[in-house]
From Swiss-Prot:
Family designation: Belongs to the peptidase T1A family.
SMART domains recorded: Proteasome_A_N (SM00948)
InterPro entries: Ntn_hydrolases_N (IPR029055), Proteasome_alpha (IPR050115), Proteasome_alpha-type (IPR023332), Proteasome_alpha_type_5 (IPR033812), Proteasome_asu_N (IPR000426), Proteasome_sua/b (IPR001353)
Record-linked PROSITE patterns: PROTEASOME_ALPHA_1 (PS00388), PROTEASOME_ALPHA_2 (PS51475)
Record's GO cellular component terms: cytoplasm; nucleus; proteasome core complex, alpha-subunit complex
Subunit structure: The 26S proteasome consists of a 20S proteasome core and two 19S regulatory subunits. The 20S proteasome core is composed of 28 subunits that are arranged in four stacked rings, resulting in a barrel-shaped structure. The two end rings are each formed by seven alpha subunits, and the two central rings are each formed by seven beta subunits. The catalytic chamber with the active sites is on the inside of the barrel.
Name used for this protein in its record: Proteasome subunit alpha type-5
Any GO BP annotation: proteasome-mediated ubiquitin-dependent protein catabolic process
Its job: The proteasome is a multicatalytic proteinase complex which is characterized by its ability to cleave peptides with Arg, Phe, Tyr, Leu, and Glu adjacent to the leaving group at neutral or slightly basic pH. The proteasome has an ATP-dependent proteolytic activity.
This protein's record includes keyword Nucleus: yes
Matching SUPFAM superfamilies: N-terminal nucleophile aminohydrolases (Ntn hydrolases)
Localization in the cell: Cytoplasm; Nucleus
């Protein structure tokens, strides 16, 4: 006997008669409503840029965290429900710390992406007290890092998939941003060119005027092997270069 559509809507572990998990689809839609996130990989490193939505003049923009460090050499940008992202990132940090403790070496970026994706699939699992989440995680992460293989950029999503990209956009402006990246990205571009492309892409898809307070930028380079969230002075300088290009 098949469940009704309404029952399928609420059943997190039950496929519909069409082979769909509606709760995962709803979580994916929540992800698409999140802040626009851009990630670009180059030979020199990876850049992440994300829109920070400041909904009120009384809101302190610096309190909004959309880019979070996972380990010294890895970080992630968040699109979707930030509270859900904290659970995933806290787990990823624990994986990175355990790996460093056991093997005395930094964790591989792909291993972190897989650990996050594995946790994404554990909704509705176990007893009520031990359950990680009673529903799918409504968040996508762009994970940037540098390991022994070089710069890496992965996306994870609510379905538990993780895929590596050269350049990727996610969130509310995905279609327009991805189209721009597809047109302008090339594998030989420098990290600085990638920084400018990331911010100029955000500029074209954001509803608000781009400034140093409503975007966040992070870099991880092959040279330093350190994930760094950049300050407002860096962002203002980058915005200035974008304006010069448009003149």
């Amino acid at each position: 006997m098949f469940m009704t559509k309404n029952e399928n809507d609420h059943g997190v572990n039950t496929f519909s008669s069409e082979g769909r998990l509606f709760q995962v689809e709803y979580a994916t839609e929540a992800m698409k409503l999140g802040s626009t996130v851009i990630g670009i990989q180059t030979k020199e490193g990876v850049v992440l840029a994300v829109e920070k939505r400041i909904s009120s003049p009384l809101m302190l923009g610096s309190s909004i965290e959309k880019i979070i460090e996972i380990d010294d050499h890895i970080g992630a940008a968040v699109s979707g429900l930030t509270a859900d992202a904290r659970t995933l990132i806290d787990n990823a940090r624990l994986e990175a710390q355990n790996h460093r403790f056991m093997y005395d070496e930094p964790i591989n970026v792909e291993v972190v992406a897989q650990a996050i994706s594995d946790l994404s699939l554990r909704f509705g699992e176990g007893s009520r007290k031990k359950k990680v989440m009673s529903r799918p995680f409504g968040v996508a992460l762009l994970i940037a890092g540098v390991d022994e293989t070089g710069p890496r950029l992965f996306q994870t999503d609510p379905s538990g998939m993780f895929i590596e990209f050269y350049a990727k956009a996610t969130g509310a402006g995905t279609e327009a941003a991805q189209s721009i990246l597809h047109e302008k990205y090339n594998k030989s571009m420098t990290l600085r060119e990638a920084e400018i492309l990331a911010l100029s892409t955000l500029k074209q898809v954001m509803e608000e005027k781009l400034n140093s307070k409503n975007v966040e930028v992070a870099l991880v380079t092959v040279e330093k092997k350190k994930f760094e969230i950049m300050d407002t002075a860096f962002i203002e300088n980058l915005i200035g270069e974008i304006k010069e290009e448009l003149i």
